[in-house]
């Protein structure tokens, strides 16, 4: 993968000049200028996902320069490097092969000359057998009862992805009740354990190293809780499975290593739901539906890898996003799913994007000071957000590009709920793009029988400037297949931006310093002695904590 500073390319210089040319052109102007704008600025995937990016402040010249930027930054060779197992995560000397986990064609993928697909398929087969035993009731707990509840204990990618997907695919769930514990705050595990029965609960401990502090603290508490009821160490093997590679510590914990599901160092945590980390998903929706999730992602992988840039959905979203942040000044992007089942989708890609592209050092080791890397990602389901933060999106002083996501078909077609939901979905992007002028506000008042003299002081507050960029992503229906494709679409968008930003998207050194300091502080919290080993603020906080506890 080549190291290319994007600001040194001819395309970047062209985009800077083009920005000035477009500075007085609004989205409304662009719709007037281009009569076929929707057709020319929308793409479809598999006749199941429609991506409309027409309500952005871009024209064909913008897209041409952005595509040239991708070419000058060697995107095509970077894609091939990822898909073929080159060690593009250079700071950790690792390949990046979450795509191999869903490689449904079984085309060989080599890492250090070895095809990884036989191992991938072996773990999938093991997961399938395990799911069949749990779901059918063949697997029994320590009193001979079948499993009714599954508790996934993990953090970060070992929690966010499985939780998001199991929630998104609740219409496909079976009789098993799913629970997720991540926070080291004892409240999280304590409240979860109140809901389950030790005789019928299975715990999945998701930690590659089996040493992750938060995960192992929660796992130990779950083990203690189980043994308090079972009073027999042999019960652990009947109620715990591990998603890990540390067989020694897994066995020491009391878990049968036959119920240890491996994954590899070329699987990053935030891209791991496709691996054994997705066991909770497969248990929740059944293995066939888990395979459909993999199939959807694989189809998007093929689209991303082979489709020309002009029709390439993840690449287009990445380029438009880069334009909004680096040339129009946006520092944040909102992901707004109009589907309650997708209520954790924004949180999932908050990690996916910000942990991947929240970097200030480029691939050459230089500090980046003349362009912006990853944006802040956030969001909530519609229409809840409309009654919370949309005010700022519409009339605030901060530019916030938004992705609106909605299914055409609801899993719960109650009365006219879905039409009301989708009417808001369509209305919001229209309002953000076109706004409402002073003249339109005045005309509304006149129509309502008001005199302009009486309302002149209120008119400015009812004006909407519009010109707020949005993407509309309409999905035929949220199924395992389409969800897999949607997730992979965003993954590849993040990858494309990382390539152009000239950063390493697959490490996360930014999480390390806090962990190191916490390990140093933890022994200081065991007694009541005052500390003086830190700065005055940290000393004061620790000492007050000790006084109050």
From Swiss-Prot:
Catalytic machinery residues: 355, 387, 515
Cysteines joined through disulfide linkages: none
Recorded catalytic activity of this chain's protein: alpha-D-glucose 6-phosphate = beta-D-fructose 6-phosphate
GO cellular component: cytosol
Keyword set includes ATP-binding: no
Assigned keywords, A-Z: Cytoplasm, Gluconeogenesis, Glycolysis, Isomerase
Molecular function via GO: carbohydrate derivative binding; glucose-6-phosphate isomerase activity; monosaccharide binding
SUPFAM superfamilies tied to this protein: SIS domain (SSF53697)
Pathways per UniProt: Carbohydrate biosynthesis; gluconeogenesis; Carbohydrate degradation; glycolysis; D-glyceraldehyde 3-phosphate and glycerone phosphate from D-glucose: step 2/4
EC number: 5.3.1.9
InterPro entries assigned: G6P_Isomerase, G6P_Isomerase_C, Phosphoglucose_isomerase_CS, SIS_dom_sf, SIS_PGI_1, SIS_PGI_2
Pfam families linked: PGI
One GO-annotated biological process of the protein: glycolytic process
Localization, UniProt: Cytoplasm
Stated family: Belongs to the GPI family.
Classification via HAMAP family: G6P_isomerase (MF_00473)
Function: Catalyzes the reversible isomerization of glucose-6-phosphate to fructose-6-phosphate.
Name this protein carries in UniProt: Glucose-6-phosphate isomerase
Annotated organism of origin: Haemophilus influenzae (strain 86-028NP)
